[in-house]
Amino acid sequence: MTADTAVSIPPYQVDDQDVIAELRARLGDDGFTLQATRTGMPVLWVSRERLLEVLKCLRHLPRPYVMLYDLHGVDERLRTQRRGLPDADFTVFYHLMSLERNSDLMVKVALSERDLNLPTATGIWPNANWYEREVWDLYGITFQGHPHLTRIMMPPTWEGHPLRKDYPARATEFDPFSLTLAKQQLEEEAARFRPEDWGMKRGGEHEDYMFLNLGPNHPSAHGAFRIILQLDGEEIVDCVPEIGYHHRGAEKMAERQSWHSFIPYTDRIDYLGGVMNNLPYVLAVEKLAGIKVPDRVDFIRVMLAEFFRITSHLLFLGTYIQDVGAMTPVFFTFTDRQRAYKVIEAITGFRLHPAWYRIGGVAHDLPRGWDKLVKEFVDWLPRRLDEYEKAALKNSILKARTIGVAQYNTKEALEWGTTGAGLRATGCDFDLRKARPYSGYEHFEFEVPLAANGDAYDRCMVRVEEMRQSIRIIDQCLKNMPEGPYKADHPLTTPPPKERTLQHIETLITHFLQVSWGPVMPAGEALQMIEATKGINSYYLTSDGSTMSYRTRIRTPSFAHLQQIPSVIRGSMVADLIAYLGSIDFVMADVDR
């Protein structure tokens, strides 16, 4: 597909210095200080007093930073490796993205524990809303002027802020939990929706509005997800999405696992993405360690990641068509996924959650006969996609239910932090595999599928075409797989290559320490973004020179996509909401982490 409104993306700018010169010209030499990191972008420290001035300046530059990609915090109180950093008990960071520059920038603010207050950025980027709520929920940092600063991940009755360093990280550190009748009644009352809290009216001039709970247990909600609908008949006047039911504290867990042992936890973020979840994490750790993996590792990782892109998209396709009323296709798509899992299981030994990538490589080399299995799949799937398109996607009922439904443009998508197929369906040609190649994607030939209307139908068609492009990439891996080792020969490769452990005592000691305690990563910060199955996923890691991460920030695409729901669906029918939810392609584990 092509789009007349495609946005032109320039070559990727790593540590773009042009914006630094522009900011110095506008703000003066004392407007900010720079921090050296391995994030691949300029990192600026600004004072709280000048924060909004700097953010507004960046938002309105000639080539603006149109997307607030991420916003979160760090508890700095136990951090020991702080050379060159300002004094801070807590830090809040703003990760901004400019498509016109094809570069990112991070703004940081240092805060004292005695004064945890910042002005809200919701007037600059509307999607700052949920991010600021999460920072308040998990750190207790207040954003003055925020329209509704309440808990978002934790229950409304929760006490404390879980990502603080003085908050317990293990269940055994808490008192035993018991749910008394009084506690149950308290929780039920806390979950009651009150329209006035959200600025909603209970009725119009001549009628009362109905408030309907969709979820948290509803098949069309695609997980433990609640949306409170304000209805005038069948029309949605407004709605309030409520998340957090699937929150498992993944970022807190990362602080108590070694760099190596956290890999299986990444599989459970987007639990349909498999090793696609491992990729940004191990790439970020490898940046910290300074590891350059062999070409064979890059190709193996890309091949398996694209297999999981296909399995995720096949599940999306079947459930999406089912959401709008067709029951049969979901059985076919699940059968087709089984063919892909046959290949994945033969290579990795597992199906949904292989946890197969390693720091510096992969768990083991490709098995004998892998090429035959891959070729059979590559030859078979394109014909199946043609059948789906002919039998289901050109169906007049499906098109009537989805064309023109839940439509938004590129500007709106960027304002809300939308990435992936949801952004490309508006005509914006931005795919990290092309725009900012990682893990060897620059060696592959493939197209970036686009559409023009940004509606529910286009989002589906973009993903179908993405599966065809994934097949192209896998086929190139099959035909051009390099020879060589499946692990880097580096001291921090984990587990290290075992072949020399019986000959060299130093290698044996390294192997023992890294398997038992885990590798010690150099102090610093690194970030890796990838084009995951549902949009852009990234890991922002802070190392304090230990065997465990000091701070692991997991930015998922689905969190941003659900925040956009009210702005898109107001004025539509309830049936349109169901089609819209299906077209987003989300899982709540990816939202709630």
Curated annotation (Swiss-Prot):
Signal peptide: none annotated. Gene3D superfamilies: Cytochrome-c3 Hydrogenase, chain B, NADH:ubiquinone oxidoreductase, 30kDa subunit. Residues 1-184 are annotated as: NADH dehydrogenase I subunit C. GO terms for molecular function: NAD binding; NADH dehydrogenase (ubiquinone) activity; NADH:ubiquinone reductase (non-electrogenic) activity; quinone binding. Residues 208-593 are annotated as: NADH dehydrogenase I subunit D. It is an enzyme of class 7 (translocase). It comes from the Bacteria. It is a peripheral membrane protein. It is found in: Cell inner membrane. Keywords: Cell inner membrane, Cell membrane, Membrane, Multifunctional enzyme, NAD, Quinone, Translocase, Transport, Ubiquinone. It catalyses: a quinone + NADH + 5 H(+)(in) = a quinol + NAD(+) + 4 H(+)(out). Its main location: membrane. Its EC number is 7.1.1.-. PROSITE patterns: COMPLEX1_49K. GO terms for cellular component: NADH dehydrogenase complex; plasma membrane. It holds the Pfam family Complex1_49kDa. NCBIfam families: NuoC_fam, NuoD, PRK06075.1, PRK11742.1. NDH-1 shuttles electrons from NADH, via FMN and iron-sulfur (Fe-S) centers, to quinones in the respiratory chain. The immediate electron acceptor for the enzyme in this species is believed to be ubiquinone. Couples the redox reaction to proton translocation (for every two electrons transferred, four hydrogen ions are translocated across the cytoplasmic membrane), and thus conserves the redox energy in a proton gradient. In the N-terminal section; belongs to the complex I 30 kDa subunit family. In the C-terminal section; belongs to the complex I 49 kDa subunit family. NDH-1 is composed of 13 different subunits. Subunits NuoB, CD, E, F, and G constitute the peripheral sector of the complex. This is NADH-quinone oxidoreductase subunit C/D. The gene is nuoC.
